Amino acid sequence: MFTSKLLTLVLVVQPGRVLLGMKKRGFGAGKWNGFGGKVQTGETIEQAARRELLEESGLTVDTLHKIGNIKFEFIGETELMDVHIFRADNYEGEPAESDEMRPQWFDIDKIPFSQMWADDILWFPLMLQKKRFLGYFKFQGHDVIVEHKLDEVEDL
């Protein structure tokens, strides 16, 4: 039987570019990713997304658009990662390095998918087109997808 861990992920998108962070420590270290983390007791998923974005990048946002929800299973683990994905098109502040992440802008045609989670290349196009999606990815280790499902949806 699986338990579930509630997590957030925020992608900051500007015309022609996306802000990613190089994860410096912990789960996913050495990979480029959006900004996010665990939902803490007493906060909503959106509050957690805003808090994690601020902590990891120094940015604040007025509006977050929920764009996706992906459940991740890692073979041998008993906990599913239930990741709620948001897109932010406007922000305040300047991206700043934190203990956990080093932010960097990437042109849309130069996103470093080879240095990211293997699933990102599959759902990023939907996110960039502002299309909503639901997904499930089963990983062997941290690099090999053994099974997946990804569907575009009207609402989340």
Swiss-Prot record:
Motif Nudix box extends across: 37-58
Molecular function, one GO term: hydrolase activity, acting on acid anhydrides, in phosphorus-containing anhydrides
Q: Where does 8-oxo-dGTP bind?
A: 23
Any inhibitors or activators noted? Answer: Inhibited by TH588.
Q: Which GO terms describe its cellular component?
A: cytoplasm; cytosol; mitochondrial matrix; nucleus
Q: Which residues bind 2-oxo-dATP?
A: 8, 33, 35-38, 117-120
Cofactor binding comment, as recorded: Binds 2 Mg(2+) ion per subunit.
Specify which residues bind Mg(2+) 2 according to the UniProt entry for this protein.
Answer: 52, 55
Q: What cofactors does the UniProt entry give for this protein?
A: Mg(2+)
- Which EC class is this protein assigned? hydrolase
Q: Name one GO biological process term.
A: DNA protection
Identify the residues that bind Mg(2+) 1. 36, 56, 100
Binding-site list for O(6)-methyl-dGMP: 8, 23, 33, 35-38, 117-120
Where does this polypeptide localize? Cytoplasm, Cytosol; Mitochondrion matrix; Nucleus
Record Pfam families: NUDIX
Cite the entry's keywords alphabetically.
Answer: Cytoplasm, Hydrolase, Magnesium, Metal-binding, Mitochondrion, Nucleus, RNA-binding, Transit peptide
Chief location of this protein within or outside the cell:
cytoplasm
Record field: catalytic activity: 2-oxo-dATP + H2O = 2-oxo-dAMP + diphosphate + H(+); 2-oxo-ATP + H2O = 2-oxo-AMP + diphosphate + H(+); 8-oxo-dGTP + H2O = 8-oxo-dGMP + diphosphate + H(+); 8-oxo-dATP + H2O = 8-oxo-dAMP + diphosphate + H(+)
* Domain Nudix hydrolase residue range list: 3-132
Q: Which InterPro entries match?
A: 8ODP (IPR003563), Nudix_hydrolase (IPR020476), NUDIX_hydrolase-like_dom_sf (IPR015797), NUDIX_hydrolase_CS (IPR020084), NUDIX_hydrolase_dom (IPR000086)
- What's the subunit arrangement here? Monomer.
User: Its family?
Assistant: Belongs to the Nudix hydrolase family.
What name goes with this protein? Oxidized purine nucleoside triphosphate hydrolase
Q: Which organism is it from?
A: Danio rerio
Q: Which lineage?
A: Eukaryota, Metazoa, Chordata, Craniata, Vertebrata
